[in-house]
């Protein structure tokens, strides 16, 4: 199994997007939405070769006639049949490889149910006959990608956000905090506040339009109250967006009200602390001697940290919470959307990592439970 010729596959299955490619590459080859779509209507044209389900970009392009489902919610796989379709699509259509010939590195959110990880292992070995596999924690991979061994990672994707403090390469499990507030909640919130403007978005396909509006136009205000005042006083913050049917809509304070919920979850009716408090609480759960190093290495990763202005706002909020003498540094690399995948690519190509793989033999001997012993 240790032949260097065989490239390992790295698959970062996010709640919103699936990133896949080969270990040693500097970017994923395939990035597509983690969606499975099924037709809402009866097929009437014979010979069209209609399928009973579509995955990823194809589902996205035919979304007008499909019901779209995300098999991963809050980082946890809730629909295994659909998940299998996504993996099948990843290996055979996107990467065009035979999964039985390559070891696979999968990723997972911290504090996920153990059964989730066992089932992933089982499917890889029994359905796809992988020769070897490994499950890595997403935030740890982001730190690898930033070239550090110490820091606290705030990883916020589509389904889940979490803060993971890591010191000299060791994750500190007692201080890991998880926040089930991420991109999908922001998309839903934007759908809601756009309704107040008189634009109605309800179907699963329309949610994808709103997600696009969010990604293109939203930003984080440095001072929310002041920004609200500016928006009320003038139209300088308004932007327009053209819908697929040609209708043009205008959005103003929604642009920063939407991502503000990351800092004020009460906007979503959630009784939890914002991402800045979560980072601070996570640091405070660590030993007093290592806090200084964590404050100086706050690494952001994941698509929901891509909003313009988020790093400056984070700096401001953490500075207000932390002791006044302490140095605070927010690291927000431009490729942070893919830093989990990039970290996986680095990890899977390290020579020292090659003995960490769970092989098919080990799996056949011990069953799915082996994943807890061999993967952090």
Swiss-Prot record:
PROSITE patterns (UniProt xref) = ACTINS_1, ACTINS_2, ACTINS_ACT_LIKE
N-acetylaspartate: residues bearing it:
3
A Gene Ontology cellular-component term: cytoskeleton
List the propeptide region positions.
1-2
What keywords sit in the KW lines? Answer: Acetylation, ATP-binding, Cytoplasm, Cytoskeleton, Hydrolase, Muscle protein, Nucleotide-binding, Oxidation
What molecular functions are annotated in GO for this chain? ATP binding; hydrolase activity
The chemistry this enzyme catalyses reads: ATP + H2O = ADP + phosphate + H(+)
UniProt lists the family membership as follows: Belongs to the actin family.
Write the protein's name: Actin-2, muscle-specific
**Natural source organism:** Bactrocera dorsalis
């Amino acid at each position: 199994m240790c032949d260097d010729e065989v490239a390992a596959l790295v698959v970062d299955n996010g709640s919103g997007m699936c990133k896949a490619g080969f270990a040693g590459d500097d970017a994923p080859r395939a990035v597509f939405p983690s969606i499975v779509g099924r037709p809402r209507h009866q097929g009437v044209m014979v010979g069209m070769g209609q399928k009973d389900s579509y995955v990823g970009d194809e589902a996205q392009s035919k979304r007008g006639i499909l019901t779209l489902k995300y098999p991963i919610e809050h980082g946890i796989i809730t629909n295994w049949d659909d998940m299998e379709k996504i993996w099948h699509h990843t290996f055979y259509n996107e990467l065009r490889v035979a999964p039985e010939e390559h070891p696979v590195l999968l990723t997972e959110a911290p504090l996920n149910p153990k059964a989730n990880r066992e089932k992933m292992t089982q499917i890889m070995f029994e359905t796809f006959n992988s020769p070897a596999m490994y499950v890595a924690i997403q935030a740890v991979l982001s730190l690898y990608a930033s070239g550090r061994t110490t820091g606290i990672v705030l990883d916020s994707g589509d389904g889940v956000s979490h803060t993971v403090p890591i010191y000299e390469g060791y994750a500190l499990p007692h201080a890991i905090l998880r926040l089930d507030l991420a991109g999908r909640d922001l998309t839903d919130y934007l759908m809601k506040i756009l309704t107040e403007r008189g634009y109605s978005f309800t179907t699963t396909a329309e949610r994808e339009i709103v997600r696009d509006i969010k990604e293109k136009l939203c930003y984080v205000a440095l001072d929310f109250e002041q920004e609200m005042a500016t928006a009320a006083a003038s139209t300088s913050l308004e932007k327009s967006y053209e819908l697929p049917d040609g209708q043009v809509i205008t959005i103003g304070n929604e642009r920063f009200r939407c991502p503000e919920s990351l800092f004020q979850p009460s906007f979503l009716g959630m009784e939890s602390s914002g991402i800045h408090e979560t980072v601070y609480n996570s640091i405070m759960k660590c030993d007093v001697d290592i806090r200084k190093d964590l404050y100086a290495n706050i690494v952001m990763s994941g698509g929901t940290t891509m909003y313009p202005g988020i790093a400056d706002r984070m700096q401001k909020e953490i500075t207000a919470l932390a002791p006044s003498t302490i140095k605070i540094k927010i690291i927000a690399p431009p490729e942070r959307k893919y830093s989990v995948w990039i970290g996986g690519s680095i990890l899977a190509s390290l020579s020292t990592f090659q003995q960490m793989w769970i092989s098919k033999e080990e799996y056949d001997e011990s069953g799915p439970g082996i994943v807890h012993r061999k993967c952090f």
